UniProtKB/Swiss-Prot annotation:
The basic functional RuBisCO is composed of a large chain homodimer in a 'head-to-tail' conformation. In form I RuBisCO this homodimer is arranged in a barrel-like tetramer with the small subunits forming a tetrameric 'cap' on each end of the 'barrel'. RuBisCO catalyzes two reactions: the carboxylation of D-ribulose 1,5-bisphosphate, the primary event in carbon dioxide fixation, as well as the oxidative fragmentation of the pentose substrate in the photorespiration process. Both reactions occur simultaneously and in competition at the same active site. The disulfide bond which can form in the large chain dimeric partners within the hexadecamer appears to be associated with oxidative stress and protein turnover. Heterohexadecamer of 8 large chains and 8 small chains; disulfide-linked. The disulfide link is formed within the large subunit homodimers. Substrate binds at residues 123, 173, 177, 295, 327, 379. Transmembrane segments: none annotated. This is Ribulose bisphosphate carboxylase large chain. Belongs to the RuBisCO large chain family. Type I subfamily. The record marks 334 as: Transition state stabilizer. The gene is rbcL. The lineage of its organism: Eukaryota, Viridiplantae, Streptophyta, Embryophyta, Tracheophyta. The modification N6,N6,N6-trimethyllysine is found at residue 14. The active site is at 175 (proton acceptor), 294 (proton acceptor).
Length: 475
């Protein structure tokens, strides 16, 4: 296969190609508390031993190259190299293995998700000796996570800002996502917020198009926010999408949102990039703005089981880069998401300390120390009949977001919002009274619909709507 390198200058320079495993496969290595640990699912090409493949991953994502080079003798590769310290076969899969790799902390720039990913996944995924490669999980040691600011505010600060406790927050993505004028867009925002939602949202691809320029949208949305707040006595928000073609333009939009008095802005963190996202997160913390994160493009990276990167890794990276909310699937809606796997990365977003649990896809114990948590957002193909399951699955520290499930109500946007708010309040009350949402959920919704005509109408419209497909990314 490919190479390796001498690790000590004293051994002298010997030109040529060596097996990677001679230097980078170290099964006796004792991992350090400061190492970044990675779990890769790898499928070697036929004839490539798994030890050689794992060592190649460690080498090509750290100090190695395809041949021995003279300048190896000018540094200490034993100090800086990545090490494949364990390999295990994947149960039920032919020629698939989990390779565990440890990276010394000094390989990475402090506070830079961009640099971390450039090193760990930047080049090795195109390596010919591997048929497929997927990064399943990372362990971020406190020594590295403490170099990141993390979420601008976090869950508790957001609740204090909104003065809303003891229940999930309710949101709605304005539809149709493209084509509305700024004034009609603002009207839809007002109707949804007046009806009882906490948030409305720009869709991920609403930026600044000819039919609705960003400044016009921001102005009409701000008017809707203040009017709905005055009428309901509740603090309201709309995720104003600041994503733009340049970082400078993105910051200009965030600044204008703050000047209007908006409480929250939004960013598409994968299409916008981690450098832009971290810059925006710093601005939001300094200026009191909450930051909603959309994961547009994630399925290009994470949906295939054998190649790419699992969303739990992208979720950890987002927590480090900065965001107060991030979309996390629904389990029950139209988007991909198996329950145990989803709850695994939801805990990685919210909790301070998460134990290793392979049944939920968590390969390493993760200690975030004091880094604030991120609210998971359940969005995509959900409606009032899903409310009991969503409340039971995601708990209070979440945002439940109904787009079509609000704006598709037969009586209009405000009644759609009323239906969702009534359904949520009924589920929270039933849970607090000790009722089993998983078993009694439909009964709880039916009981609430008897005194809410808006909910009754919603129940009738969506009584047969289900998204029953097999999940691709399973454990």
């Amino acid at each position: 296969m490919s190479p390796q390198t001498e690790t000590k200058a004293s051994s002298g320079f010997k030109a040529g190609v060596k097996d990677y495993r001679l230097t980078y496969y170290t099964p006796d290595y004792k991992v350090s508390d400061t190492d970044i640990l990675a779990a890769f699912r790898m499928t070697p090409q036929p004839g490539v031993p798994p030890e050689e493949a794992g060592a190649a991953v460690a080498a090509e994502s750290s100090t190695g190259t395809w041949t021995t080079v003279w300048t190896d003798g000018l540094t200490s590769l034993d100090r800086y190299k990545g090490r494949c310290y364990g390999i295990e076969p994947v149960a039920g899969e032919e020629n698939q293995y989990i390779a565990y790799v440890a990276y010394p902390l000094d390989l990475f720039e402090e506070g830079s998700v961009t640099n971390m990913f450039t090193s760990i996944v930047g080049n090795v995924f195109g390596f010919k000796a591997l048929r497929a490669l997927r990064l399943e999980d990372l362990r971020i040691p406190p020594a590295y996570s403490k170099t990141f600011m993390g979420p601008p505010h976090g869950i508790q600060v957001e609740r204090d800002k909104l003065n809303k406790y003891g229940r999930p927050l309710l949101g709605c993505t304005i539809k149709p996502k493209l084509g509305l004028s700024a004034k009609n867009y603002g009207r839809a925002v007002y109707e949804c917020l007046r009806g009882g939602l906490d948030f409305t949202k720009d869709d991920e691809n609403v930026n600044s198009q000819p039919f609705m320029r960003w400044r016009d949208r921001f102005l009409f949305v701000a008017e809707a926010l203040f009017k709905s707040q005055a009428e309901t006595g509740e603090i309201k928000g709309h995720y104003l999408n600041a994503t733009a073609g340049t970082c400078e333009e993105m910051m200009k939009r965030a600044v204008f949102a703050r000047e209007l008095g908006a409480p929250i802005v939004m960013h598409d963190y994968l299409t916008g990039g981690f450098t832009a996202n971290t810059s925006l997160a710093f601005y939001c913390r300094d200026n009191g703005l909450l930051l909603h994160i959309h994961r547009a493009m994630h399925a290009v990276i994470d949906r295939q089981r054998n190649h790419g990167m699992h969303f739990r890794v992208l979720a950890k990276a987002l927590r480090m880069s900065g965001g107060d909310h991030v979309h996390a699937g629904t389990v029950v809606g139209k988007l991909e998401g198996e329950r145990d796997v989803t709850l695994g990365f939801v805990d990685l977003l919210r909790d301070d300390y998460i134990e290793k649990d392979r049944s939920r896809g968590v390969y390493f114990t993760q200690d975030w120390v004091s880094m604030p948590g991120v609210l998971p957002v359940a969005s995509g193909g959900i409606h009032v009949w899903h409310m009991p399951a969503l409340t039971e699955i995601f708990g209070d520290d979440s945002v439940l977001q109904f787009g079509g499930g609000t704006l598709g109500h037969p009586w209009g946007n405000a009644p759609g919002a009323v239906a969702n708010r009534v359904a949520l309040e009924a589920c929270v009350q039933a849970r607090n009274e000790g009722r089993d949402l998983a078993r009694e959920g439909n009964d709880i919704i039916r009981e609430a619909s008897k005194w809410s005509p808006e909910l009754a109408a919603a129940c009738e419209v969506w009584k047969e709507i289900k998204f029953v497909f097999d999940t691709i990314d399973v454990l």
